[in-house]
Amino acid sequence: MYDYLVVGAGAVGMATAYHIKRLSPSSRVLVVDQHPGVGMGDTAKSAAAFRTIFTSWINRTLAKTSVGFYREVQNSGYDLGMRHVGYLFLVPRENEATMRAVAHELIKAGTPVELYDKMDIPIRTRVSEDEEAREMGLPDVSVALLVKEAGIIDPERLVRYYYEKYVEAGGEVMFGVKVESVKFSPKRPIGIPGEPFPWQDARVAGVETSAGPLEAKNVIFATGAWTEMLMDAAGFGLPIKPRKRQVFVVKASGELGDLLRAGLADREYAPMIILPRGIYVRPEPVEESFWIGVSDRRRYGFEENPEPEEELWRFGIYPVLTKYVPLFEGKTPHNAWAGHYDENVVDYQPIVDRLAEGLYVAAGTSGSGIMKADAVGRIAASLALGLEKAELHGGMVVDSAVLKKTRCFEEERLVI
Amino acid sequence: MYDYLVVGAGAVGMATAYHIKRLSPSSRVLVVDQHPGVGMGDTAKSAAAFRTIFTSWINRTLAKTSVGFYREVQNSGYDLGMRHVGYLFLVPRENEATMRAVAHELIKAGTPVELYDKMDIPIRTRVSEDEEAREMGLPDVSVALLVKEAGIIDPERLVRYYYEKYVEAGGEVMFGVKVESVKFSPKRPIGIPGEPFPWQDARVAGVETSAGPLEAKNVIFATGAWTEMLMDAAGFGLPIKPRKRQVFVVKASGELGDLLRAGLADREYAPMIILPRGIYVRPEPVEESFWIGVSDRRRYGFEENPEPEEELWRFGIYPVLTKYVPLFEGKTPHNAWAGHYDENVVDYQPIVDRLAEGLYVAAGTSGSGIMKADAVGRIAASLALGLEKAELHGGMVVDSAVLKKTRCFEEERLVI
């Protein structure tokens, strides 16, 4: 009988398990994952960038404290592959006024950002002189915002860090075991098969897995894109849906190599570049390449073995990418992969909630799970431990229920 | 080319279409439904009760104005089968304090409710003297609340009323046609197959159906339990999920007949009775019977042809029902049916929102669609017509975006 069973050994699950063990060393904690090791689900398929600068309080709080923790780990000598290359938002005219307002707010608050007027934008785009681009309806870039407290990280090292610390502290793991459902038992059994019935008070008893049942007093689902199907089947409705995501890798050779090494604001490498129409270009210095993706309005749904689609590159990304950054002309990806976002379809923020006695969920990170994993893990651990408050890295304290599904957050204005 | 195409001829869809036509008589409006007539989906499977008394503002506003409209229709001579039999909440001790607080608030506000102390509760229950009930963990009833502005209605007549008025006003309908998907077209076509691509500005062009494409400038999905699968496929995430619901019908013969005719507060028939553990007993005077259901924590999911499950009656309802109302002992349902709720899994309120240019949704009524259909229809019509405000029955004005998916409502405290 485990005290806490965490389903999912991705960034959120491992951070949660680590923080449970840290806060309650004598508890018996188990992490179960269907993969043969940690971080092999969608954590490994992340675009793995981070920033701490957002307009909404909740984004800022989760990302800033998490990234602060990662930085401390990195500075302590455990290399997480963090590089503070920055984010460069290339902003079309239609959004210029909004972006200027956001930038001025940030600058006033002392945030390290830089606003470039059209003529000073450090990445040359040719949309304004290109007739085809105009026919395609692609907007000219009229201003750019460089966000400096931002960069890239290696999610596999991050999750491995949590895993090592967790195991050191006596945490247990079970890999290659798939959790199939959550089990409840009646608080007052009456001895009739089929219990618990709808009218019986019940609490979590454990989970059914591909390797048989596991008993636990508390189960925390940190199951990302798998969350919807597991919780639907258990009768707990969450506004979290899986959505396919794809990343295409282009070698940074020739002039693209120069672009890769053209860091801004004294950084060694190019920033994460956010183009209009949801396309992003992420530097990958170790592999001398760029990772490219797009936030497309794709159907929701889960694919058992998601594969990257050449068509998305060809029709969804390439035509726009090459208009804004002509250096990519003629390039084709030499690698690509696909995974899932676990998207909160209401406010795109994670949900950490208690769904029933002994049943918790920590999911819905909506594409920013890596940069928020530490805070989400601390909140999930505190909630599962029955603490009213969660202490985030750096000492900031939030309500453990801050991410419950019925919360209300302001809308983020600085989005990809 | 239609100006407005409403998908779904249930209560919400027909109310929406009727109000569009009422507010914009010259618009060409079409209602499409897969069934051979109006109200043949989940509208016909509703428990079809109404109340106007809630603790939350939004529940009160939607139900009170809608029921006010139905009452006016009924009083004008168009029989909607409304009977103001009331709702009787039988409250277990664990909820007594909350219910007393709610009741005192309501009484202070001049709401027609009546609170019965244990000895005066007009329905005799025997839980307190029953050892088996105690072993089952069933709580004794310690107080009861009678809500008078409440009762039952015939949803098929209601939807027929809207249908007749809509057709009279020149509205068009297409039955037996299943809408399969929503179609978009690029605002600036470039003439390449596969348009619109993710980076193109697009707007609704119409729908694909089992009978071929239909063109429309605006499409409103009033698709209840079908909403999730249709909108998931279109890439629009909503916190709305289908959940099976079942109603069991028991003949009101012998002493049950006396119970049926034992109206409270001068009403002719028994009230809708809400037992502990989510079981409700609805009088059906026309058929001399009771409709019985339970809000069970059932898995989410859609069934193509949902059937009632004898097991739910036998293990989920009967053991509890007979403990609270022993008159049901030995009774078996002579009829039953199953349908779906379209449940908003966050706040159990309807969502009326604009998802893209020309694309609207009006769904998620979560089991109170009949009693809120008029207000939801007025809000959906106003939003689709581009009006900032919606005028509800009785002259109350709300923002047309009041039910957008990112709203924040207080939690309802008076629930089944």
Regions found by a protein language model. Name each.
Chain A
Residues 1-12, 30:
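Beta1/beta-strand and adjacent pyrophosphate-binding region of the FAD-binding site
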Residues 5-7, 32, 207, 214-226, ...:
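Short hydrophobic core segments
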Residues 12, 37, 226:
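Conserved Rossmann-like nucleotide-cofactor binding loop
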Residues 18-23, 50-51, 78-86, 197, ...:
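Active-site substrate-recognition segment that forms the wall
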Residues 21-42:
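Glycine-rich FAD pyrophosphate-binding loop
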Residues 47-132, 278:
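Dinucleotide-binding Rossmann-like beta1-alpha1 core, especially the glycine-rich loop
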Residues 94-202:
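Flavin (FAD/FMN) cofactor-binding and adjacent substrate-gating region
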Residues 117-127, 311-388, 393-414:
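Flavin (FAD/FMN) cofactor-binding core of flavoprotein oxidoreductases
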